Amino acid sequence: MDPALLRDRELFKKRALTTPAVEKRPSASSESSKKKRAKLELSSTSGSKPSSDGSNGSFNLKSLSGSSGYKFGVLAKIVNYMKTRHQRGDTYPLTLEEILDETQHLDIGIKQKQWLMSEALVNNPKIEIIDGKYAFKPKYNLKDKKALLRLLDKHDQRGLGGILLEDIEEGLPNAQKAIKALGDQIVFVTRPDKKKILFYNDKSCQFTVDEEFQKLWRSVPVDSMDDEKIEEYLKRQGISSMQESGPKKIIPVQKRKKATSQRRRFKTHNDHLAGVLKDYTDVASGKP
């Protein structure tokens, strides 16, 4: 190669290394186009997800049509609706068509209807069938405040304690109004988990206790003792518990079965040759 050309090549390399390279800033139009592309991608991905109702945040069941989630979503809506109408006082049963009409689910398929009729509503513990129609089945079916007071009184007499407020609200139409009307005939107790329990207020048990007896009662330390130790101590003092003084269940004595006598079976050999074989024991014993 020509040495002049080699010299020129080396000089060009040196100049290229010494000159600083500056990158151009991206134009505003290119940045805006990138942002638009990102927005389009986000909108396309969000459009593929199941739609939800923006007004109340509830999930759109129709987007899951044909899936198990859609079926169970319809079932949950039906049960909640039946509970709400029972609490309003509408306790009469409805047909499936009436329920679907009131819950705005008349457009469900035949398979879903068949599943609701033959399996879902029949086996649901909160739904009962009355003459081919469906009604809500609460834990305590109460008609009015008198029925509530009788139930609380029965629980008190049997030593069952109180009843959860949510169970009463579930089964008693217009429960808050009835509870307010009962006034001091019932007592509220709030548990550590913030759930309220209703008790019957037995006014016959309201009496003044002597102050001296109260002091004696409060002076007995029982913090370090569990229920078993307290029960043992009371037994040693000759005080029996209510369980021991109450009626005891008599356990029926089971009759012994007579032992059946079974004959012992001995093994027998060569029964099929009984007429052919001969016994030579006497002959063998006669030999010297």
UniProtKB/Swiss-Prot annotation:
Predominant location: nucleus
GO molecular function: DNA binding; TFIIH-class transcription factor complex binding
Binding region for DNA: 63-143
Any single GO BP term: transcription initiation at RNA polymerase II promoter
GO CC term (a single one): transcription factor TFIIE complex
Transcription among keywords: yes
Places the protein is found: Nucleus
Segments of skewed composition (Low complexity): 41-56
Region (Disordered): 16-56
Keywords annotated in UniProt: DNA-binding, Nucleus, Transcription, Transcription regulation
Family classification: Belongs to the TFIIE beta subunit family.
Function: Recruits TFIIH to the initiation complex and stimulates the RNA polymerase II C-terminal domain kinase and DNA-dependent ATPase activities of TFIIH. Both TFIIH and TFIIE are required for promoter clearance by RNA polymerase.
Protein name stated in the entry: General transcription factor IIE subunit 2
Classification lineage: Eukaryota, Metazoa, Chordata, Craniata, Vertebrata
Gene that specifies this protein: gtf2e2
